[in-house]
Regions:
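Catalytic-site microenvironment of enzymes
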Residues: 1-180
């Protein structure tokens, strides 16, 4: 299966002198450009996101970090440090979500941790407080996957009427330090 992100609109001869961004804004009239978005999940220092482009206006992404809650995913070790997959996947998911927002996309962060935010530490400490948009994450793997599926589908039923392009992005990280 191949997924394509919508192409950036290029200025044609008819729009010469206008920037690609201006052309994208014109085609996205029902998605007015926001200048800033506030997302507390990014952490105290990064919660305000400056929207620098409108090229992803009209798109909606469901960003899902792997594991979380009672399931840390793969666990690797570096010296005395344990590396828990869910913490790194969550950090990467937040960074991706923030970048998508800077480009004008609407982003739904499915797995959430109100405390962690985007972290700069080399070794991220583990926690079990992640939720699926406020709901506790089940221990049972099938229930966990079903919970995420149900949440994304419920959001999509509403979002597909408003956005021309909706996609889910799932992030997993293998933190084992030796070959598989």
């Amino acid at each position: 299966v191949t997924y394509l992100i919508p192409p950036v609109k290029k200025a044609s001869a008819a729009t010469s002198g206008k920037t690609t961004e201006a052309a994208a804004e014109k085609t996205s009239a029902h998605h007015p450009r926001r200048t800033e978005v506030n997302e507390p999940l990014f952490g105290k220092w990064l919660s305000n996101v400056k929207v620098t482009s409108n090229r992803l206006a009209g798109t909606c992404f469901y960003v899902v970090s792997g594991h979380g809650g009672p399931d840390p995913g793969a666990i690797g070790r570096v010296g005395k440090h344990e590396l828990h997959e869910d913490e790194y996947a969550y950090d990467i998911a937040l960074r991706l979500a923030r970048n998508l927002m800077q480009e004008g996309a609407e982003v739904r962060i499915i797995i959430q941790d109100a405390k962690d935010g985007i972290r700069d530490e080399a070794y991220l400490s583990n926690s079990k407080r992640e939720t699926c948009m406020g709901s506790p994450i089940p221990l049972n793997q099938v229930q966990r996957l079903q919970q995420r599926c149900d949440k994304i589908n419920a959001l999509y039923r509403k979002d597909r009427k408003k956005y021309k392009y909706c996609r889910a992005i799932f992030i997993h990280v293998d933190s084992r330090s030796k070959g598989t």
